[in-house]
Amino acid sequence: MLILAVLIGAGMALVEPVKGLIRQKYSNDAIAVAESAIIQGEGTITFEVPASPALAIPGEEGEEDTGLDKLIRDMKELSGEHESLTLLGILEIPCIDVKEPIWDTCSANALRYGVGRYPGTSNIGEPGLCNLFGHRQIGNLDAKLGSIQYLQEHIGEEVIVTTTDGTMHIYKIVKTVYVKDADLMPYLDPKTYDEETLCITACGWGKDPVTGKTYPMNTEFIVICQPASED
């Protein structure tokens, strides 16, 4: 019985890393498809990703069930239904080694495989505020924006967004802020800024790795970027 318990425990410990690798594979495949579209200037394209709840990010749906039944169900569901998502381009933040596909939605499923444009905010490259959301889940190997809080040490660094029509948009980081969910609305309104502004948003709760300050649940970390000058 002890050996069986050890084997079960070891198997369960491997589940999240395996799921992370699967999610990352689809993210990488989406980047490859976007890069091909960029070269050819294809414009907006679609890409299929798994829609199975088996690939949910830890904490996405509340407390995780870690029982053996859950493990077996998850493994059976991995080949289930897929969803077609609109792929807008690629987000790159060189100073923290981020390169992720950008989806035209912030659905839970889309954010498992990249970052998403918040519905109703400006389109990339247009006047007003465009907000890209992503996960900063603690302890996940495939956290899309796992190092985002370090950008408070990189004011002035470049953020690059290349859309699938082949257009490269280069921004500079101008500011980072922590915002409570209750105060988030200005960062979801395209009219908050008249000029073109890119925000990148992820959860901000927990201990800040730079300042050491601890932030409560329902807090977001936002990076505010504006177009780099051409001179």
Describe each PLM feature range.
Residues 2-231:
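Solvent-exposed, non-transmembrane regions of membrane-associated and secreted proteins
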